């Protein structure tokens, strides 16, 4: 395995890179997106600045190496999410010089060693109940990162949705056969779709919000958040009739501040839109 030392890996889109500087070879397996690993940080990180991280520090007084345990899909900061991606390119016993290049061009540098893979189950070998637990974990990580790191939250929600969607139609799942019933899986899937809608609203991708909240039209009692986000997307798309109809799916919407404010905005914009249309028509035929 001498040839492996010096091997380089790079993900230009994410600004990630690593170069192998040492190897105590044990096996060629690499961590998966659901693995649990033990790794060491061998020296202080450079150019970390004030960026939060559970694993990397730039403290001169810290002692090294620092050993950590990490379950993939649980990182709650941008730096640590990237650290997960880097570790997924390691083999056990590998030491590598790693870097994360930020949008401003700063290069955060650090040295990692993958001590061992504690748990390395392949996703395709998981049962429906196990997939549910992984998706739930990813969803919870997404919720925890949404306010501070929305793009990473979006990634967590997408990963969770992709895991669950393989079991559609959910009503085929039973507790006896699959370890979990379809209703529980569908409820989690709808929660994730609602969370995706929040991310997409931030990015002004309103058509995608409509797509991910289609269930609002068919569910007997869709959540308040899902109704509001769908109505807000219709409002921004200037589909005011649909926005108003969506709001009316919410019982006693008049008593809810956000809904009441959105309804008023819809009414004003709808009126202005009709007045503008009338003015355009008059100009055309005057």
UniProtKB/Swiss-Prot annotation:
Record flagged with keyword Membrane: yes
Pfam families per UniProt: Bdbt-like_TPR (PF21603), FKBP_N_2 (PF18023)
Keyword Membrane: yes
Subunit structure: Interacts with dco (via nuclear localization signal). Interacts with Ankrd49; interaction promotes the stability of both complex members.
Name used for this protein in its record: Protein Bride of doubletime
Topological relation to the membrane, as annotated: Peripheral membrane protein
BP GO terms, sorted: locomotor rhythm; regulation of establishment of planar polarity; regulation of intracellular protein transport; regulation of post-translational protein modification; regulation of protein catabolic process
Protein task: Functions in planar polarity establishment and circadian rhythms by promoting the activity and localization of dco/dbt. Required for regulating the levels of dco/dbt and per in the nuclei of photoreceptor cells and thereby is involved in normal oscillations of the circadian clock proteins in the eye. In the dark, the cry circadian and rhodopsin visual pathways, activate the accumulation of the protein into Arr1- and Arr2-dependent cytosolic foci which are required for dco localization to photoreceptor nuclei.
Gene3D superfamilies (alphabetical): 2.40.30.320, Phosphotransferase system, lactose/cellobiose-type IIA subunit
Taxonomic placement: Eukaryota, Metazoa, Ecdysozoa, Arthropoda, Hexapoda
Keywords: Cell membrane, Cytoplasm, Developmental protein, Membrane
Subcellular location: Cytoplasm, Cytosol; Cell membrane
Main localisation: cytoplasm
Phenotype caused by lack of the gene: Lethal. RNAi-mediated knockdown in the wing disrupts cell polarity. RNAi-mediated knockdown in clock cells, results in behavioral arrhythmicity and long periods. RNAi-mediated knockdown in the eye disrupts oscillations in the subcellular localizations of per and dco, leading to constitutively nuclear per and constitutively cytosolic dco in photoreceptor cells.
GO cellular component, as recorded: cytosol; plasma membrane
GO molecular function: kinase activator activity
